[in-house]
Amino acid sequence: LDKEINQCGRKLRNLKKPVHHIRSKYEKIHTRYVKGIRKHNPVIFNPYDLTVRSGVTKSQMRKMLEGSELVTLAPVFVKAEHKYGVNAVGLASIAALESAWGTSRRARQDHNFTGFGVDSDDAQGINAASDQANIMRTAKWLAKSYLTQDGIYYDGTGLMEINHHYSASFTWAWKVEHCVKQMFENLQ
């Protein structure tokens, strides 16, 4: 399945505007992949809907983030899912990508793990008083502005739709999914 997903992903990235049948094939393959993971593990991640709760526990999230600087924030990702309804795995993977797994200067010095308010490398960003505050603020902002139909940046509830306003990079959603894949590999 990984090989099929990678092949479809490459085809999509090579096109300026994804062709419907390629995306449809990718979605079918990805659905089989997610079902396979769910069969062996109750943790859920749906890249087409970040409002679907993961059901991840704090200990599972710690295991998923093991070996990274984000491991101490595992309970915060779970809390954010319960409070704001944003999938904890998706939120953690955004933090993993945006902060280089918690090692970036912004993460360490500015408590900005999610790229919140950062629109260029020079941008100051919207920093928080603590690491936990940044994660909770981002979850609240995603829930309110990106994942609800009356939200200012709403284009849909999936990573690709969030990508439109969250990041200037058109490959952002794919990179976030790659982080998710790494997290699930840690869980097995």
Predicted regions and their residues:
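Extended amphipathic alpha-helical heptad-repeat regions
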Residues: 1-35
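Catalytic cores of secreted/periplasmic lytic hydrolases that degrade extracellular macromolecules
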Residues: 21, 25-90, 96-188
